[in-house]
């Protein structure tokens, strides 16, 4: 499928649902331990890249990232967590991924870069540990077991943002290439 039609739209619905479910899994793993919360981008690189690159390669036309971003926003609405900290990054990342794909004329390079960008769609969820630490700490104290908040702060020094982002990017590139080889994209 190179462009939008009824068949590609139905497949995109499936990709969007898989993307939303994968994103939910990424977010839920953070409840297991503070280290997994800090490593959310790494988990996203592993769990979401295959879905995203598959969708991008199957529909080489505008709107694919928008469908995935919309699925993410619908998920946030469903779980009643559609706050600015979460929704605005999704919108920015979606627009950026669409723009990159368009600039590269929907070729492999643009799709891989777009995939890496889209794996950051849940950054507003976990990025607060670096940019809104007091709020994150308060939420962790209220919502998580005793000691989780302190563990989260200990596991997220400023430098860890760079390590997590780079690892997430590398894993996204690797998973995209593995997916392409497995599914002959």
Residue ranges of predicted features:
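Membrane-embedded alpha-helical hairpins and interfacial helices in multi-pass inner-membrane proteins
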Residues: 112-184
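Alpha-helical membrane segments and adjacent membrane-interface helices in multi-pass membrane proteins
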Residues: 40-98
């Amino acid at each position: 499928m190179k462009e939008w039609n009824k068949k590609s739209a139905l497949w995109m619905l499936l990709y969007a649902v898989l993307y939303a479910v994968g994103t939910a899994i990424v977010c839920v793993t953070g409840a297991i331990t503070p280290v997994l919360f800090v490593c959310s981008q790494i988990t996203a690189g592993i769990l979401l890249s295959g879905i995203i690159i598959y969708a991008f390669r199957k529909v080489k036309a505008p709107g694919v990232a928008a469908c995935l971003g919309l699925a993410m926003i619908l998920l946030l609405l469903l779980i009643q967590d559609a706050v600015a900290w979460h929704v605005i990054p999704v919108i920015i990342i979606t627009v950026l991924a669409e723009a990159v794909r368009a600039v590269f004329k929907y070729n492999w390079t643009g799709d891989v870069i777009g995939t890496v960008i889209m794996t950051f769609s849940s950054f507003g969820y976990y990025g607060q540990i670096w940019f809104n630490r007091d709020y994150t700490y308060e939420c962790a104290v209220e919502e998580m077991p005793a000691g989780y908040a302190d563990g989260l702060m200990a596991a997220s020094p400023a430098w860890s943002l760079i390590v997590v982002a780079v690892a997430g990017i590398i894993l996204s590139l690797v998973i995209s290439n593995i997916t392409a080889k497995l599914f002959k994209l």
